[in-house]
UniProtKB/Swiss-Prot annotation:
Protein name: Nuclear envelope morphology protein 1
Primary site of residence: endoplasmic reticulum
A GO MF label: protein serine/threonine phosphatase activity
The gene coding this protein: nem1
PROSITE patterns, per database record: FCP1
Compositionally biased region (Polar residues): 234-256
InterPro entries for the chain: Dullard_phosphatase, FCP1_dom, HAD-like_sf, HAD_sf, TIM50
Oligomeric and partner information: Component of the nem1-spo7 complex.
EC number: 3.1.3.16
Region (Disordered): 47-74, 164-190, 232-256
Domain FCP1 homology per the UniProt entry, residue ranges: 299-460
Origin organism lineage: Eukaryota, Fungi, Dikarya, Ascomycota, Taphrinomycotina
């Protein structure tokens, strides 16, 4: 039994030992193969590494630096801009070329015949279309226009018995003899020119002699006032007429060399109608003057003076001890007394009122207050620019029945050109015809009295005598 066990053990050992020898041989073979592979791989890796290093070095040498990168990036931008500019220049030149080519083709097309061939006949036909036809069309268009008068018509500066478009037959003769200073005559009437005393304006009078068809034209220079006599009286002796137009006769100066002058010229004015330019009718008179007549009145009237009150007309002042403390504080220094603080309130729209009336009138401030009180307030009103030409105070007033009366005659202005605006009737009691009353103002913020006066004051600057207009207030 023991021998059998021993035999089995040996067999097992032999079986187990045989694979182990084969594994070791395989391991050796594998190790040798791995060694050969590793050496080949190492050699291949070294070759790849050397080639990679060479390529990397060459690429690194050719790679731009950081400083060179922006310059290369800028070049495409400039190239793009230049490309756009060149493109638009090409477009512009192409359009100019197309325009000239098209114009030349259109121009040359007029010199071709219907078969689009250039011949001598087609050339002359195109020349006629370009040169002669426009001239003929303009001539034809000129013939279609209404004919223009060949003789210059006289200028009329007023409307009289016949319309201004009427051509006076004596005007041509009057024009011929205009340069001469002596007497001249024509076949259809008497044309007289006196020696020019004033000179330049001439009046042509047409008067009927015996019938309506026969006229006598007299051309007279304006004479001195002593050579014209006015005899205007209404004829009331005729029966059957309620009124007769008033007539004014102008007698020309006597001259021994003139025998055919009419005795008088009649201007008819209806006393029942308004003496305006449309109502005034001058019979048988035609005005032929080279210049517009001079105005009878001087257009430049002297500048008028406007006197303004201070307290309760332009401003309202409140002392320091009152309830309200708003407004502009102004300290008043009265000699011999302590300074007093006043709060000044402007009347609504005062600045706008003063800025307008200062352009129309010469302004004077006349107040019944004392000078130490009034001067700081007036200076406050004139802080932007000087408004008042003069200032008058309580010492310039007259005390009448315990009231201060302002005598505006001390301003040395004629009473026809001076006005006063005051809220106290006692202040302008001496010159009521020069006064413009106004309501006193204390604290009403909706007051518009100064604005309402502007349109009236604007009209007063063109009045000859302000008393004629302001005195209507006193008429009963």
């Amino acid at each position: 039994m023991n021998s059998i066990a021993r035999l089995s053990d040996e067999i097992n050992k032999a079986i187990l030992a045989t694979p182990l020898d084969d594994d070791e041989a395989d391991k050796e073979k594998l190790a040798n193969a791995r060694g050969r592979a590793s050496s080949a791989t190492l050699r291949h890796y070294n070759r790849r590494r050397s080639s990679y290093s060479a390529s990397s070095l060459s690429s690194l040498s050719s790679k731009p630096t950081e400083k060179e990168v922006p310059t290369r990036n800028e070049k495409p931008k400039h190239a793009n801009i230049m490309r756009v500019v060149v493109y638009w220049i090409r477009v512009f030149l192409k359009r100019i070329y197309t325009f000239f080519v098209h114009s030349a083709r259109v121009f040359l097309y007029h010199f071709l015949n219907e078969e689009k061939e250039f011949t001598l006949a087609s050339f002359f036909w195109g020349l006629c279309r370009f040169v002669f036809f426009p001239v003929l069309l303009s001539y034809k268009r000129r013939e279609m226009l209404p004919p223009q008068p060949s003789v210059r018509r006289p200028r009329f500066y007023s409307s009289y018995s016949y319309p201004s478009s009427h051509q006076d037959p004596a005007y041509s003769s009057f024009k011929r003899h205009r340069s001469s200073n002596s007497y001249s005559s024509s076949s259809n009437g008497n044309h007289v020119r006196f020696q020019p005393s004033i000179a330049e304006e001439e009046i042509s009078f047409n008067s009927f002699s015996n019938s309506l068809n026969s006229e006598e034209d007299v051309c007279v220079s304006p004479m001195k006032p002593k050579e014209v006599s006015l005899m205007g009286k209404a004829n009331s002796n005729r029966s059957g007429h309620s009124h007769q137009p008033q007539s004014t006769q102008f007698s020309p100066p006597a001259n021994d060399n003139i025998s055919k002058l009419p005795s008088s010229f009649t201007i008819v004015n209806d006393p029942l109608k308004s003496p305006s330019s449309s109502r005034l009718r001058i019979r048988n008179i035609t005005l032929c003057a080279d210049k517009i007549p001079r105005p009878l009145l001087n257009s430049k009237l002297p500048r008028k003076t406007l006197v303004l009150d201070l307290d309760e007309t332009l401003i309202h002042s409140v002392s320091r001890g009152s309830r309200t403390t708003s407004g502009q504080p102004i300290e008043v220094h009265v000699p011999g007394e302590h300074p007093i603080l006043y709060y000044i309130h402007k009347r609504p729209h005062l600045d706008y009122f003063l800025s307008n009336v200062s352009q129309w009138f010469r302004l004077i401030l006349f107040t019944a207050s004392v000078q130490p009180y009034a001067d700081p307030i007036i200076d406050y009103l004139e802080r932007d620019k000087k408004i008042f030409a003069k200032r008058y105070y309580r010492q310039h007033c007259a005390l009448v029945d315990s009231s201060f009366v302002k005598d505006i005659s001390i301003c040395n202005i004629h009473l026809s050109r001076i006005m006063i605006i005051d809220n106290s009737p006692a202040s302008y009691n001496a010159h009521k015809e020069n006064a413009i009353p106004i309501e006193g103002w204390i604290s009403d913020p909706s007051d518009v009295d100064l604005l309402n006066l502007l349109s009236f004051l604007h009209a007063l600057q063109y009045v000859h005598d302000v008393r004629d207009l302001l005195g209507l207030r006193l008429a009963k």
